[in-house]
């Protein structure tokens, strides 16, 4: 994660130059350091973030509503304007790949590149890249097959749990969190910000929509297209994937 000493007054000057509406809290300090972008949930008063609803501890917050941040930037498109600001002040550092013990990585893998994150600029219709600041965490006993792609997180990390195994051609997108001992057959595609429990099987050529929450002990059949959350202990299959039965026990081998 980038960690720079940018003063609050420098960001405020940028906000004024670009004609944003803003409010300052009673504890505004022009020399307060804002040193990193952050998710709203994890933000502290030294962070810059964005939000569409709810409160945040961020020192600088782009949002569509007034809040208690030291500098609150008011905008109809918080994510887009947050991107414009952090692109100006916080260039991403190279991705760190943090590996546990006994990690095996196949040939021609791409691990730690930026993911496919863009936001449309409503003024001219162009697509603006969301800078990626997160890292990759690979647990113990992770095996990655040939031609895998695992992209770094945007503001948080992409996390692969202990004992995860992937076949060739698997794609796991930014911000995904994969639980322990999950298995991914060839050409499985996991979109961004998926959260998956433990002991799951993802069949060949199947896909999971972004931000889906997949429970533990879930079996996803070959070629399935998962477009919503999946509870624990079920078998899903089809396009779109549907629950077809209870998953009563762990699969014990791959043949």
Name each model feature, range by range.
Residues 93-237, 241-244:
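Structural signal for interior beta-strand "rungs" in well-ordered beta-sheet cores
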